[in-house]
Amino acid sequence: MAKSSVLSTFAAAAITLQLLLSSASASPHMKYIDAICDRAHDQAFCVKTLTSNPPTAAPIGLLPLAEAVINLATSHAEKTAIFVDENAKKDPAVKAAFTECHKAYMAVAAALKSANMKLKASPDTANYDVRASSDHMRRVNELVGKNSDKTSTTLKEMTVQMEKLLDLAAGAADAVDDDDENIRLRV
């Protein structure tokens, strides 16, 4: 008797979980998140990021979600620029490289702000602005990629995160455009 009670409880829990998962993926919000995450290189990261951040978790439309995604990337670029600037002042050994990294992150933040302003009127241009930021990330990797100090390691981790967020931002701009001419850039 106890064994069948445990089994029926387990079955009920499994059915409830299945219903919750299917209703979450069928929610109107998920179609906007899917429109962006389908364009991302790391779709699991995309879904996790967009569903766990309040500004992106329950979008009211594709354009507001895309703007929120680009804002998320902008915020990370600005925070990383502050981190780099503060550490350039503290450690003379990394000052020259970090000064250049600071410039790169400031350029990324500016490009993302520009992309967000252009998103509605010209999503192709916004997509270009976001994708051009990848050049700055390559520069940061060139400057600190071989460094093994703790601060450089932290910056490398922040740069990996920035690259992932840039991918989401590019996917967001592309989703707003939705003409799939940029699909070749995602392959």
Where is each model-derived feature located?
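Folded extracytoplasmic luminal domains of secretory or organellar precursors
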Residues: 26-187
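Terminal membrane/secretory targeting segments in land-plant proteins
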Residues: 1-28, 187
